A protein has these predicted regions:
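Short, structured protein-protein interaction patches enriched in aromatics and acidic/basic residues
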Residues: 55-76
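N-terminal single-pass transmembrane signal-anchor helix
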Residues: 1-28
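An almost-null, non-specific background feature
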Residues: 13-19, 33, 49, 136
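N-terminal exported-region signature
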Residues: 22, 177-181
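Serine/threonine-rich low-complexity intrinsically disordered regions
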Residues: 2-3, 31-36, 56, 76, ...
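Aromatic-residue detector
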Residues: 11-13, 29, 40, 171-174
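Membrane-proximal N-terminal amphipathic helix
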Residues: 26-57
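Intrinsically disordered, low-complexity regions enriched in Pro/Ser/Thr/Gly and acidic residues
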Residues: 71-173, 182
Length: 183
């Protein structure tokens, strides 16, 4: 009889502990504040100009794995999504528009998603992508970059997550850097 009571006490204790843990986890979940579409457009301009600035409210940060392809050579990269609750019902795919960042929205949230930045001086092609270890940000700053790939190519084709980003004729040294976004 005592073994049944012990088993029941253990099961009951486990159920209670599970409820307490799930409650504590929900307390730590950060819900972003709502933000206007216009405010996100201003954030986009600052990000595309690589400025350090304060955000109007805390943004949730999500980092997604991505693939950078240089003439068939795959380089592991990432995309950073900064998002807030949306006041408007907007859906934007976050398509690549030739800049490092683009607008993104899904009816509930609105934000910006990173792509890659490319600088070509005719000799060296520098490609930058972004990452972050933060869960949320109130301020945008950039840490020093980390070189993740060096190479040299003739007639280079660059794609990012399956999207053709650029094609360069002639010989280029290529440098791929990862820049971390901090708060």
């Amino acid at each position: 009889m005592k073994s049944i009571e012990l088993v029941l006490a253990l099961v009951l204790s486990a159920i209670i502990a599970g409820y307490i843990i799930s409650y504590l986890i929900s307390l730590n979940r950060v819900e972003p504040k709502e933000i206007t579409f216009h405010a996100v457009e201003e954030i986009l301009v600052n990000l595309n100009n690589f400025k350090e600035f304060s955000l109007p409210s805390r943004a949730l940060v999500e980092v997604k794995p991505a693939t950078l392809v240089l003439n068939g050579i795959e380089v592991n990269a990432s995309q950073v999504l900064l998002m807030w609750k949306s006041e408007e019902n907007v859906v934007l795919q976050g398509a690549y528009k030739g800049e490092a960042w683009s607008l993104w929205a899904n009816n509930s949230y609105i934000g910006v998603i990173s792509w890659i930045a490319i600088q070509d001086n005719g000799v060296e092609l520098k490609i930058v992508f972004f990452t972050s270890s933060e869960k949320e940000l109130k301020h945008i700053s950039y840490s020093s970059s980390k070189v993740v790939f060096r190479g040299a190519f003739r007639n280079l084709r660059v794609s990012f997550n399956g999207i053709k980003v650029c094609e360069v004729e002639g010989f280029r040294k290529v440098l791929v850097e990862e820049i971390s976004i901090k708060g």
